[in-house]
Regions:
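Short, ordered, surface-exposed loop/turn motifs in non-cytosolic proteins
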Residues: 294-313, 334-336
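Extracellular beta-sheet/turn segments enriched in Thr/Pro/Gly and aliphatic residues
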Residues: 268-280, 353-391
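Bacterial Sec-dependent N-terminal signal peptides
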Residues: 1-21
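A short, amphipathic beta-strand motif
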Residues: 285-296, 600
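Short Pro-Gly-centered beta-turn/loop motif in secreted/extracellular proteins
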Residues: 326-338, 342-346, 353-356
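Short, acidic Ser/Thr/Gly-rich low-complexity loop/linker segments typical of extracellular
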Residues: 310-331
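Hydrophobic/aromatic-rich core segments of domains that either
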Residues: 22, 131, 135-136, 140-141, ...
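Secondary-structure boundary elements
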Residues: 24-175, 211, 397, 406-554
Length: 600
């Protein structure tokens, strides 16, 4: 009896100790705490507010981990309560899912806990997906659960190319379609919601043909497997891209935070650790690089760009920086790259053949005055080297049957969208094309049109500024903010930023005293921003755009969000402003001419 009581006591002690620490390694916990305090000094503690939230020690450590490494936008645009809710859902999977205790702390921390997958707007998908998927995968082994989640994803989203802006998981479901970057973001979010480590894998450019692709890796029972997002197969490690992937030069993913896993690190920043996954897909080789100046001395912190030939250009697939000894290295598929090294206006380059070259020295002996006019290069991609996993006829037939059924579910949902035929008698016929393009967001666009029927010209002008994707996910409160604002500059979008909060009426009031002078001379607005908005000192920070309201609130941002902020404020005050779609310069119009904005 005493032995039983002692055993129970020790079990309780161990469990409570585990529960109190999200990060069990004290050294890493101290590193995270140091990074958290540094972040608070940059953004201000008002954006980390746990008052009234009843945060446990374990939850607080998880919050500190997220805040330590999240982009500034995620700290200033989403309240602490939002992040805490998602943490609680993630921690719940440790006890509610059968694999919860099998997932290593390292993988849970970096590939389950984080909400952000790529550059999508964050949403409330985690709790929603957990409620639906936890029941659906009940009783399944981990690998089968991954396959089942992908079937669920296929019921809701299929492939369609679109613009560069990435929709959130819930926005993708509403639309029923997404490009590969959106499908993989959605599938990673679904897997993480039930405690399965998952990451978006990306080949920035194929080596053997134009284009790129993104898919998913998920961890089960000690191993990472790949799958085509929203493209279910009977088994893992099988997708349409098995053969192209075997010919790739680079595969990478961004692990949230300071990740200390076994993979080769390509870049480590204060937000993420970019890791090289090429070894999972084909035959690879490593080359050591040494960067020297014209005198042959090692160059510290030289930027080294590894370039793949694609779309008739040498595209930078990854950038690394040399150490104090002037060296760096890369593992890649056995093909050719151009390696371009530079620092302080000096540069040099060389062709690297992975699988043949072992080490290469690049001298920074060129500049703008003496750069070569041409170079004769033969670029050879890796050879195909594919071994497909076995699939029985019964497995293939069952998978095909399921795909057909899943298509019918998705098609039934899409059939609820308005069509030209169903809208042929609509009284506000000029708005019909916008309502049809809105797909799953059609009720919002239709309600907006009808609410402002007495201001139809302005309402239609506003809708005409929106892209097809904007029509599919623009909320009513953003439309109304732009509709009710006094400004004639109706467009709410500058580039591919997230539009999360209303801002035009806010800035009308915030700059009421300065508005007249800013309209007369927009350079004064440029000067105001230069004097009042600090730049994030971290030059390698992940540039997720902040909303203009959070730039105003935090008074700290990066150059991208600062430029968006300028255009949004200018338009709010009736000043015509834009991002030049060709040169990507911020401009305002004065005396009928576009004037470039220079913040430097």
């Amino acid at each position: 009896m005493k032995k039983i009581l002692l055993s129970l006591f020790l079990t309780v002690v161990c469990l409570s100790s585990y529960a109190q620490h999200f990060i069990t390694d004290p050294n890493f916990r101290q590193k995270v705490e140091s990074a958290f305090q540094s972040k608070m000094k940059v953004i201000g503690k008002k954006f980390y507010n746990t008052k009234g939230l009843r945060v446990s020690p374990e939850e607080e450590e998880a919050l500190h981990f997220l805040y330590a490494y999240m982009p500034i936008a995620d700290a200033t645009d989403y309240p602490t309560a939002y992040h805490l809710k998602n943490i609680r859902t993630a921690l719940r999977t440790r006890t509610s899912m059968p694999w919860g205790k099998k997932v290593p702390e390292l993988l849970f921390r970096h590939f389950v806990l984080p909400m952000r997958v790529n550059n999508e707007p964050l949403d409330s998908s985690r709790a929603i997906f957990y409620r639906e998927l936890s029941e659906r995968v009940k009783g399944l082994p981990m690998k089968d659960a991954i396959l089942e989640v992908n079937h669920w994803c296929h019921e809701r989203v299929t492939y369609e190319p679109s613009d560069a802006r990435t929709s959130s998981p819930l926005q993708s479901i509403r639309t029923g379609r997404g490009r590969c970057g959106e499908e993989s973001t959605f599938t990673v979010a679904a897997l993480r919601s039930i405690g399965i480590p998952a990451r978006q894998v990306y080949t920035p450019r194929w080596a053997h043909t134009d284009d790129n692709h993104a898919w998913v890796e998920a961890w089960a029972d000690g191993k990472w497997y790949f799958l085509g997002a929203c493209e279910p197969e009977p088994v893992l490690n099988l997708a349409w891209f098995n053969e192209p992937a075997s010919r790739a030069m680079l595969m990478h993913t961004r692990a949230f935070g300071d990740y200390e896993g076994p993979e080769e690190v390509m870049l480590r920043t204060n937000n993420f650790t970019e890791i090289n996954l090429i070894d999972n897909y084909g035959s690879t080789s490593k080359i050591d690089f040494k960067i020297v100046d014209k005198d042959g001395k090692p160059v510290d912190n030289a930027k080294v760009d590894f370039k793949i030939y694609n779309y008739a250009e040498f595209y930078t697939a990854v950038s690394k920086y040399t150490g104090t000894d002037g060296t760096t290295f890369l593992s890649a598929g056995k093909g050719d790259m151009i390696v371009w090294a530079s620092k302080d206006g000096q540069f040099g380059f060389a062709k690297a053949t992975f699988g043949k070259d072992k080490s290469i020295t690049i001298k920074l002996d060129y500049n703008e005055q003496n750069m070569p006019k041409e170079a004769d290069l033969d670029i050879v991609p890796p050879a195909s080297n594919t071994t497909l996993p076995a699939v029985t006829k019964a497995q293939r037939d069952e998978n095909t049957r399921r795909l057909t059924y899943e298509d019918s579910i998705r098609h039934a949902y899409i059939a609820t969208f308005p069509t030209a035929e169903s809208m042929k008698d609509y009284r506000y016929s000029a708005a019909t094309p916008y309502i049809i393009k809105a797909r799953g967001n059609w009720k919002t666009i239709k309600a907006f049109v009808e609410k402002y029927a007495n201001q139809q010209e302005r309402a239609l002008q506003l809708l005409s500024t929106l892209s097809d994707k904007d029509l599919r996910d623009m909320p009513m409160y953003i439309l109304e903010d732009n509709m009710k604002a006094k400004s004639s500059q109706l467009s709410p979008r500058v580039e591919s930023e997230m539009i999360l909060t209303p801002f035009k009426q806010f800035f009308e009031k915030a700059f009421a005293k300065e508005a007249a002078s800013f309209r007369k001379n927009p350079a004064l607005l440029v000067d105001w921003i230069r004097k009042n908005i600090r730049m994030n000192p971290d030059s390698r920070a992940m540039r997720i755009p902040q909303t203009p309201r959070s730039v105003w609130e935090s008074r700290i941002t990066d150059s991208r969000s600062r430029d968006i902020f300028f255009v949004d404020v200018a338009r709010s005050l009736g000043i015509e402003a834009r991002m030049d779609p060709v040169a990507w310069k911020i401009q305002y119009k004065q005396d009928g001419k576009w004037v470039d904005v220079d913040f430097d």
